[in-house]
Amino acid sequence: MKGITLTAPKRLRGVIEVPGDKSISHRSVLFNAIATGSAHITHFLPGADCLSTVACIRALGVTVEQPAERELIVHGVGLGGLREPADVLDCGNSGTTLRLLAGLLAGHPFFSVLTGDASLRSRPQRRIVVPLRAMGAQIDGRDDGDRAPLAIRGNRLRGGHYELSIASAQVKSALLLAALNAEQPLTLTGRIDSRDHTERMLAAMGLEITVTADQITIQPPSEATAPTALSLRVPGDPSSAAFWWVAAAIHPDAELVTPGVCLNPTRIGAIEVLQAMGADLTVMNERLEGSEPVGDVVVRSSSLRGTTIAGTLIPRLIDEIPVLAVAAACASGETVIRDAQELRAKETDRIATVAAGLSAMGAVVEPTADGMVIVGQPGQLQGTTLNSFHDHRLAMAWAIAAMVARGETTILEPAAAAVSYPEFWQTLAMVQEAA
């Protein structure tokens, strides 16, 4: 699918079961691979990134069955059971796969090489390599370890204390996984305020991990505290649901429902921002499923106003910023996004690509070093041709913008959406047909 052309529909209606959460899907496979016993995982996200994790785990000697598209059975091999891979581990386009595996493999006594596609090989890895080396890991890579391929010669690691300088769940998780093969406890301080699925899942698997407001400490597992398999239903991904929340909020005649979405406090920044912008957004039927809070989110047509997105909000909605920028372009007044320099290290430089795309649609957008300023105006977007640059979040953000744009919007390389949302285009058609 080289390109898709969209026009704004008269109405949007539907109940949308969004795909399983991408972060939790990755972790359910990685963590259960080193657990004792077998785990049954349902509502797994069968997107390209998560399937890269499955392929790498299989290459490390773990049996992973897939009885249905969204269902896995992972037969754990225990903490010391991974075996040296016979070939290079290809992480595809998945930064989560590469970074979490780097942490996990750094403490295993064998040689491995992690690589990926051209986009992943261009993304910075020093953020994990430097702290892992401080724990005693032997990791080499291009540009002194800042670019994949990464060659890892695993060995016994040190624990101790490390202060995180950026709020990144991938960095935090890589270090916590490395600590499972460390000789002492590991304590993390600093920017620990990123999504906490790793901490929740490891605790649910029986590991001794203590989390406070300003630090995380994990103890090296003993026989008594070795991880045990954790079966789970993966909740809906709030980063995927956010596309529908914004679509409903900016469209003049819309009501969309996303049931069973993960409402982890570290992931609901987009809900808080949309509510601050005046969105008609209701959270219902809140409950706990496994180690994660979930609920149903209903959004109706709204009159949005500009807001500020910055500070501790950023790590709680970093993946939703492209579509929140679309919401800002359709709101009344100015929206300021700052402290989001992490966007420049994503699949594309999302500050540059989002600003350029919205500007091409007629929005007033000024990119900055760590974000952008958007002067919103309802009804200002004009259809045009936009490139996803193979970035899944861009492809879907442009589709949502097209729902309110005048004229036709053509999106190039729309198949990129399959990385995190394989059914996105079918669902988009459904909510227009149901109207």
Curated annotation (Swiss-Prot):
Question: Reaction catalysed?
Answer: 3-phosphoshikimate + phosphoenolpyruvate = 5-O-(1-carboxyvinyl)-3-phosphoshikimate + phosphate
Instruction: Tell me which GO cellular component terms the UniProt record holds.
Output: cytoplasm
Pathway assignment: Metabolic intermediate biosynthesis; chorismate biosynthesis; chorismate from D-erythrose 4-phosphate and phosphoenolpyruvate: step 6/7
Give yes or no: UniProt keyword Acetylation.
no
Report what the protein is called: 3-phosphoshikimate 1-carboxyvinyltransferase
* Principal location class: cytoplasm
EC number(s) from the headed UniProt entry: 2.5.1.19
Q: Which UniProt keywords apply?
A: Amino-acid biosynthesis, Aromatic amino acid biosynthesis, Cytoplasm, Transferase
Coiled-coil ranges (or none): none
Q: Which GO terms describe its molecular function?
A: 3-phosphoshikimate 1-carboxyvinyltransferase activity
Q: What domain of life? A: Bacteria
Which GO BP terms sit in this record?
amino acid biosynthetic process; aromatic amino acid family biosynthetic process; chorismate biosynthetic process
Lineage runs:
Bacteria, Bacillati, Chloroflexota, Chloroflexia, Chloroflexales
Enzyme class comes to transferase
Amino acids binding phosphoenolpyruvate: K22, G95, R123, Q170, R350, R393
Q: Which residues form each disulfide bond in the chain? A: none
Q: Where is the catalytic site? A: D319 (proton acceptor)
Question: Which positions bind 3-phosphoshikimate?
Answer: K22, S23, R27, S168, Q170, D319, K346
Q: How does it assemble?
A: Monomer.
Amino-acid biosynthesis is among the record's keywords:
yes
Where in the cell is the protein located? Cytoplasm
Pfam families attached here? EPSP_synthase
- Tell me the InterPro entries matching this sequence: Enolpyruvate_Tfrase_dom, Enolpyruvate_Tfrase_sf, EPSP_synthase, EPSP_synthase_CS, RNA3'P_cycl/enolpyr_Trfase_a/b
**SUPFAM superfamilies tied to this protein:** EPT/RTPC-like (SSF55205)
The record's annotation in HAMAP family points to:
EPSP_synth (MF_00210)
- Origin organism is Chloroflexus aurantiacus (strain ATCC 29366 / DSM 635 / J-10-fl)
* Summary of the function given for this chain in its UniProt record: Catalyzes the transfer of the enolpyruvyl moiety of phosphoenolpyruvate (PEP) to the 5-hydroxyl of shikimate-3-phosphate (S3P) to produce enolpyruvyl shikimate-3-phosphate and inorganic phosphate.
Tell me its family: Belongs to the EPSP synthase family.
